[in-house]
């Protein structure tokens, strides 16, 4: 059908926006469908294309239009298909629909899922073995890094590329691996050559060093085992290398008949078990199926249980089957290979009937036969063999040492460079550095071989019941040790706690005692250093005192007139104890104390205790209260050396002792009372008696001091009891005596009278000639009269003191007597 061009009102239809419906009518006519009166949805418009066209004469900027150069320009004349009524085009409506969860209708059971290849790994997982193999086994140290920096500078000057750290680590690893592999091969080759050309090499089966034509000795090129052709069943020696059965399969099995590995082994019928050919020959129950090929080994099951139960006398292992000594009376068992290693006598005897008999002897019978052989042959063949063996060993060790020193000759730089794909120059630098570093490390490898690392790993083993029982037994023993340690630690801590508590109690009692003495205004008799450190032992010193002035002689004569000169004059003390001493004499005695001559002082030491007790009981209160001058002069002005010297004087006297004195015993009533009084209240007695401070105090110390060893061996308990007793006595000392019963006061006076009538206890600690008595009997009688006159004058001049001092003097007497009576 011919297409007609529609009539246009303009000259150029391209410029008029007319619309042609001819094509639509044409399509409607052509379609011949029932809906021919229906309006079309699309129409073709040409005006859009005509509006885009420009005439060729129209001048336009070349940048503002496009030039069509294709050949399908005429197709644009047909028009563009557009919707007939754009307003009636339906608008799409959208809504979001929730995703529907798919119901799982079938779940594949996991028990039916199996991995076909155990080596394959799932995607996303890492194979640890592959990762470990890919990691380099050598790490650079600081020296390597510094050297690598210098190498890169030299390579940059040469115009070569640098070498990074990872590449150097891989190069060193390859060098070590090549060196290790080539050294192992060289050692095997050297060992094989040594065995092959050694005249003393023997067959591993028959133990014979001889060979003959057609029965040559063959060596395995891998394990270097030496066998005869007939012994191992080699029908024809192959050209080139030869490997034994186990080396062909690449395994290293263990013999079922002995605990040894390696050697000339053959398999059984099943092919799963291996046994030495020598073991199969020497054990009578075992046989070989094909003697020509010497395989397979059969009748292992015919070995009786009694043979399996035998224990080897050489290796002490109950493994495999043992043979016994051929001597009928000997039952010693041993493995065949153990007998070969220890050099036992193993004989192969060919019988008349072409039967082979095997004779084996234990260590004892082999030595007897060797001794008989040495008697027949005087040549020391054994010594020569040992020397040859030692020479062979030393030669082999020397070869190995030379091989280790020349390790660098086993590595080729070209092979390493080809394997790593590196330039030969860089590899050669690293090779020389590796050689120097290994030389500085005594030719030792820079890291251990891989085989050693794998062997060093702990392989899991099947735990048997015996192993578990042994483990539990060791665990129980360890727990028992822990329990004992815990008990010992707890006991130690308890002892430390009790020790600390005792020390705390001692410290508290000491502080309490010191506080009470300070409150009472008394001197600190028991100071801290006296309780913690015991007094030193008594020492007798030889002193030379300077000559005194006339005033000192006058003062000393005044003092000596008031005291007895010897123990014989003790009766005069009792006769004048009721007399009063003038106050002037008291002051004069106190002031002139530091300048006493030692000769006159020694005369008064023996009678000072009795005189002080009598004066403390019956004298006036003026005798019981010391003055401040006496306190400061008597207790604080004595050096330690002088006290020690006078302490030794107290037991000398006139060089005589009283054998009838009851104070020689320290465990009686009176003796213990005197010791307790003089020891505990020595400071108070010095003030009450108005005597020199060292007289009664040191006499009491001389009667109750023990040796140094006894003082230092006192326990904490004894020390605590001593402080407790001192505190109790001090409390009795401070308390007033109003509450004391007349009976207790009476007993105290009786004990005081008894102790005053006796001389103090004397100990012969030593003799000092410079401190001897110097006054005579006549002088002492004259001094007695002067003492009586001064006492009468003091009674008339000095009034009695207050009752408080009197009570204070009584409190020093009665508590002491009361405590002594209780003891």
Curated annotation (Swiss-Prot):
Gene Ontology CC terms, in alphabetical order: histone acetyltransferase complex; nucleoplasm
The protein's name: Protein Jade-3
Induction data: By estradiol in estrogen-responsive breast cancer cells.
Record keyword Acetylation present: yes
Any one Gene Ontology BP term: regulation of cell growth
CDD domains in alphabetical order: ePHD_JADE3 (cd15706), PHD_JADE3 (cd15681)
Protein family: Belongs to the JADE family.
Zinc fingers, C2HC pre-PHD-type class: 252-286
Bias-annotated ranges (Basic and acidic residues): 781-809
Phosphoserine modified-residue sites: 85, 566, 608, 774, 776, 780
Organism: Homo sapiens (Human)
Pfam families reported in the protein's UniProt record: EPL1, PHD_2, zf-HC5HC2H_2
């Amino acid at each position: 059908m011919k297409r007609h061009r529609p009539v246009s009102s303009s000259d150029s239809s391209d410029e008029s926006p007319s619309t042609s419906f001819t094509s639509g009518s044409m399509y409607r006519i052509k379609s011949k469908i029932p809906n021919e009166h229906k309006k079309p949805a699309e129409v073709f418009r040409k005006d859009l294309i005509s509006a885009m066209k420009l005439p060729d004469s129209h001048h336009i900027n070349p940048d503002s239009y496009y030039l069509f150069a294709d050949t399908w320009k005429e197709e644009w004349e047909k028009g563009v298909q557009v919707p007939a009524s754009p307003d009636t085009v339906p608008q799409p409506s959208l809504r979001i629909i929730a995703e529907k969860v798919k119901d799982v209708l079938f779940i594949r059971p996991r028990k039916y899922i199996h991995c076909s290849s155990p080596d394959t790994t799932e995607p996303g997982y890492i194979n640890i073995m592959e990762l470990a193999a890919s990691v380099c086994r050598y790490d650079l140290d600081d020296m390597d890094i510094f050297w690598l920096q210098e190498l890169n500078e030299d390579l940059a000057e040469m115009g070569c590329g640098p070498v990074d750290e990872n590449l150097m680590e891989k190069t060193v690893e390859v060098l070590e691996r090549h060196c290790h592999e080539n050294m192992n091969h060289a050692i095997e080759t050297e060992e094989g050559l040594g065995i092959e050309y050694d005249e003393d090499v023997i067959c591993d089966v028959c133990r014979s060093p001889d060979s003959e034509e057609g029965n040559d000795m063959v060596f395995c090129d891998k394990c270097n085992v030496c066998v005869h052709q007939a012994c191992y069943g080699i029908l024809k020696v192959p050209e080139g290398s030869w490997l034994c059965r186990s080396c062909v399969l690449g395994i290293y099995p263990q013999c079922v008949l002995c605990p040894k590995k390696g050697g000339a082994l053959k398999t059984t019928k099943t092919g799963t078990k291996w046994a030495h050919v020598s073991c199969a020959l020497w054990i009578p129950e075992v046989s070989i199926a094909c003697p020509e090929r010497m395989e397979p080994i059969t009748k292992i099951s015919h070995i009786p249980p009694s043979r399996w139960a035998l224990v080897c006398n050489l290796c002490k292992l109950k493994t495999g089957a043992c043979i016994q000594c051929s001597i009928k009376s000997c039952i010693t068992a041993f493995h065949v290979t153990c007998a070969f290693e220890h050099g036992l006598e193993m004989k192969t005897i060919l019988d008349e009937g072409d039967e082979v008999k095997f004779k084996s002897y234990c260590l004892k019978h082999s030595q007897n036969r060797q001794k008989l052989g040495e008697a027949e042959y005087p040549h020391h063949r054994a010594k020569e063999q040992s020397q040859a063996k030692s020479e062979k060993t030393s030669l082999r060790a020397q070869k190995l040492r030379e091989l280790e020193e020349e390790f660098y000759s086993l590595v080729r730089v070209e092979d390493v460079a080809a394997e790593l794909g590196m330039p030969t120059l860089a590899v050669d630098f690293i090779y020389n550095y590796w050689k120097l570093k290994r030389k500085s490390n005594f030719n030792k490898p820079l890291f251990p071989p891989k085989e050693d690392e794998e062997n060093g790993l702990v392989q899991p083993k099947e735990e048997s019941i015996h192993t578990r029982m042994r483990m539990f037994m060791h665990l129980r023993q360890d727990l028992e040790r822990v329990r004992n340690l815990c008990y010992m630690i707890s006991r130690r801590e308890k002892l430390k706690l009790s020790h600390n508590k005792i020390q705390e109690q001692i410290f508290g009692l000491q502080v309490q005692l010191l506080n009470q003495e300070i409150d009472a205004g008394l001197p600190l008799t028991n100071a801290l250093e006296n309780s913690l450190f015991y007094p030193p032992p008594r020492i007798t010193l030889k002193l030379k005192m300077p000559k005194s002035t006339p005033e000192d002689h006058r003062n000393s004569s005044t003092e000596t007139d008031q005291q007895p000169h010897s123990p014989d004059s003790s009766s005069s003390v009792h006769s004048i104890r009721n007399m009063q001493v003038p106050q002037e004499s008291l002051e004069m005695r106190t002031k002139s104390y530091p300048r006493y001559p030692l000769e006159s002082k020694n005369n008064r030491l023996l009678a000072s205790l009795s005189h002080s007790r009598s004066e403390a009981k019956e004298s006036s209160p003026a005798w019981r209260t010391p003055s401040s001058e006496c306190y400061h002069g008597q207790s604080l002005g004595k050096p330690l050396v002088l006290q020690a010297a006078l302490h030794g004087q107290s037991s000398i006297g006139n060089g005589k002792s009283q054998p009838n004195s009851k104070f020689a015993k320290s465990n009686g009533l009176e003796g213990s009372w005197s010791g307790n009084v003089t020891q505990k209240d020595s400071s108070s007695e010095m003030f009450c008696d108005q005597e020199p401070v060292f007289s009664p105090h040191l006499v009491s110390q001389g009667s109750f001091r023990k040796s140094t060893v006894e003082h230092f061996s006192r326990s904490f308990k004894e020390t605590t009891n001593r402080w407790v007793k001192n505190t109790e006595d001090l409390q009795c000392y401070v308390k007033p005596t109003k509450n004391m019963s007349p009976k207790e006061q009476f007993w105290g006076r009786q004990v005081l009278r008894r102790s005053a009538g006796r001389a103090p206890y004397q100990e012969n600690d030593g003799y000092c000639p410079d401190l001897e008595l110097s006054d005579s009997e006549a002088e002492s009688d004259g001094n007695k009269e002067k003492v009586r006159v001064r006492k009468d004058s003091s009674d008339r001049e000095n009034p009695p003191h207050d009752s408080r001092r009197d009570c204070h003097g009584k409190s020093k007497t009665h508590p002491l007597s009361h405590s002594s009576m209780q003891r």
